[in-house]
Structure formats: structure tokens, C-alpha cells
Amino acid sequence: MALDPAVVGRGYPPSAVYEVGRAKIAEFAAALADPDPAYRDPAAAAALGHPDVIAPPTFAIVLTLEAANVVLDDPDVALDYSRVVHGEQRFVHHRPIRAGDRLVAATTIDSVRSVAGNDLLTTRVELTTEDGEAVCTATSMLVARGTA
């Protein structure tokens, strides 16, 4: 079944607050095998002008992937997850994610289109501090195979 373009523009309530911890950043950096000391050592991060350790740029996926799941759970979207593959992911960082940040994620459906018998669903997740400071915009495209 093809996705309904009427869902374009639909926004979802912000996520619960996620507090970014040094240990989580270090674990993520280790999983990437990234030795950058700014991800583990507050002094190294301070030497770069940051108030605490910073996260690798792709750390945003920890929050944005979970936040985008509201789309999968939306019965109006009616996405058959068994037919879905991840087509694209982009991050635009407004500033680095830092240890101690208290972040919320708000998800919006940006587009739905059909191409070659597949539906393409693009979502945008805005990561902000709980005070509203923009931190990262994540855009992802899901491909629902053979539904259009």
C-alpha cells in the first residue's frame, strides 16, 4: 500500500530529555575506534574551546533514531517496517554535542514520494537543548520497497 502524502508536515511531540554523559560519548567513540582525545579527555576538549568532552558527529544517531521511531508507530503512516531499508542519513550540526547537554528531539515528516515502485519517506529530527538552543538537524530517508 502506498504511503499517504497527507502525512507530510506532520510533527510529533518532543522526546523526553536525554542527558549526554561522558561515559556514553566514550563508549560511542570506542565503538567507532576513534582515538580523538576530545571525546574522552575534558582537558583536550577544553584546549579546543569546549566546556567538556564533545561527541563524535554521528553520536546524534543515538537520539535521532529513537525519536524518528514515532513515525513507525503512527497508524496513519501505516509503514510496513518489514519492507523498509534505510536509504539516506544526513546531519547538520549547529554546534558539537557535549557532555552535560540535556537534549530533546522533535520529529517531522518532510516528504513522501514514490519512485520506481517504492515509497520514500523523509523525516527531520531537530535536536535542541531543553532550553531551545539548536544543536543538530538530522534528516533520514526510509525506502519502503514495492509499496507504491
Describe the function of each predicted region.
Residues 1-3, 88, 92-148:
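HotDog/MaoC-like acyl-thioester-processing domains
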Residues 1-86:
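Hot-dog-fold acyl-thioester-processing enzymes
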